[in-house]
Amino acid sequence: MQRIRPFVAVFLTGLIMTPAGLAQEVTSALASSKPEVPLAPGTGFINSFTRNFRQPDIAPAYLGNSPRLESLIRAGNLYLSLEDAIAVALENNLDIELSRYGPQIAQADYLRAKAGGLLRGVPTAVRAGATSALSQAGGSGGQGTGGGGGAGLSGTSDAGGTVITQTGVAVPNLDPVFFFASTLGHSSRPQANTITTGRTALVFDSRSWQSGYQQSFLTGTTVSLGWNNSNVRTNNPLNDLNPNTSSNIQMQLTQRLLQGFGLAVNNRNIRVAQNNLRVSDLVFKQQVMTTIAGVVNLYWDLVSFNEDFKVRKQAVDVAVKFYEDNKKQVEIGTLAPIEIVRAEARVAQAQQDLTNAETSLMQQETILKNALSRTGVASPTIADARVIPTDALTQPRHDTIDGLKDLVDRALAQRPDLQQAQIQMDNTKIGIAGSRSQLLPSLDLNASFQNNALTGTINDVTLPGGGLPNRNPDPYFIGGYGNALAQLFRRNFPDYSVGFQLNIPINNRTARADYIRDQLQYRQQQLTFQRQVNDMRVNVQNALTALIQARARYEAAVKERQLQEQTLDAENKKYALGASTAFQVVQTQRDLAQAQASEVAALANYSRARVQLDLNTASILEKYGVDIVDARSGKSPRPVASNQR
């Protein structure tokens, strides 16, 4: 008995410690970021053993805003620089926060794949974000054309695949399993012939218990170890041993030789899950790029709305002054009364334009605040705050534009949607290995090794007439359970078996259909990727053309505004000398106001074109100094720029 105790201890320890080793993976992948509570003395082993069967702690969704947003509000106004807007968006924007869960979901899928489970897929949707009030207004007034806010990379929202359906050979379950079963039994069997046993019924009391361990491997191998025991007590006087205990230790091995053989087939889900970790990071990066582009557009649109409001207000002041001057001249009799009506009509039109500009400005403030807050405008403090942009639009003459070839090369190397498409093609090629393996016949090698043991005490049940039968049991089988264990480990009564099983599907239509479909799908993805590359080249070239044209339009708008200022000055001088009419002066004032608004709109359009080009070439994060690691953490290290002005 003393010789076998060390072996039993090692065997049971190995069975118990196997689940504890897997617990670290569950904790690292799914546990929340909250620090663990230290365990009380004596509970470490229980915690390690049971953590695989407890629900991991997942931190709840945080719906509050970062302190940065509140710190920017002073005296009821939200003073906002572009740098602050980007930092607040990284911390509070809901689209970015939703996308932060993608890598965590991919990590959970990777954990599932390492256990041999099917993949559930990773989210790849990218939301374009809020639309500027300029687009909602249809570009009315002097704000020209072009939509701000909802910038994005077209045709890339589904790259990577959200749902993966596995075809081909099933992946083995890679999580080891320990099992234990115990049974207590009682049976009574009436006997038609009492001559042999002298009993009208044989009664059996039995106890059995089984334990074992099973594990599958990526090579296509399945190994199971079992330990089976049975103890039987009976009223049969003919048994030499009563009660008797039978025991066996067995090992069974199955190796797949054709279908389902090899690492390339059985670890394909793990490799796909590893690729999906990269996909989830790329999706997050794409969402950050899209959101930052949208916030920058919203900010510059707000600046342009502010400038347009100032232009409209100045136009009202000019119209009012002209009206008052005409009124005085009518009173002294140097001007016809009809000229007052014309001047008053100009004031009304200018005030209407001012009202429209103020409406667009307030709408844009609301849209921007909603993009920068997790609670939108639910907070009265945020809802009532007027947004004061502290940055001015950049003049195009200070901007440099790279050549088309450099821009296309940069987009090919950096755009996350193209990288996602390449990874998806790689995933499909990995999956084809399973479909290819399923085409093969199933040939399995089976081997079994078993050691048997029997022990018990001499039967003391008497015959019906009295007395004991003549018993002469082998002393080797007489003893307790330790005797059975000794027989097992001495391998006194071994069993061996080796064989194979071959299954040949006659038509093999399912496997052939899956392989054909996977190959066709891969070719579709190749064509889709080429289409994406072609679209990227077109988008980059169009964005570059739009930027160049926007610069030219801005320069023309500046020239027009300067000429209109000169024209109005000349018209006012002619009017003072009586060489012009009030109608001509009013018309010139209207033309100048329109030219000023067109200049503001042209500058805003240039800013949007610049953002779109940076987005299409995947250089927008670098342009605005956004670190993707900081974006993933949800905490921007940028100082509050507006408070430093």
Identify the residue ranges that each predicted region occupies.
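A glycine-/polar-enriched beta->alpha junction
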Residues: V88-E97, Q107-G121, Q166-L174, H186-Q191, ...
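N-terminal cofactor/phosphate-binding cores enriched in small/glycine residues
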Residues: G76-G160, I164-N193, V203-R207, G212-Q215
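Transmembrane beta-barrel strands of outer-membrane/channel proteins
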Residues: F178-H186, L225-N231, L445-N451
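Amphipathic alpha-helical coiled-coil segments
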Residues: L98-A113, Q287-R312, K321, K328, ...
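Regulatory alphaC helix of protein kinase catalytic domains
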Residues: R54, P60-V88, G403
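Transmembrane beta-barrel architecture of outer-membrane proteins
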Residues: S81, D175, S206-S208, S246-N248, ...
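Hydrophobic, small-residue-rich alpha-helical packing segments that form membrane-like cores
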Residues: L225, T245-D353, A357-T366, N370-S373
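Acidic, low-complexity, intrinsically disordered peripheral segments
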Residues: Q2-P6, V10, A20-L39, L119-D158, ...
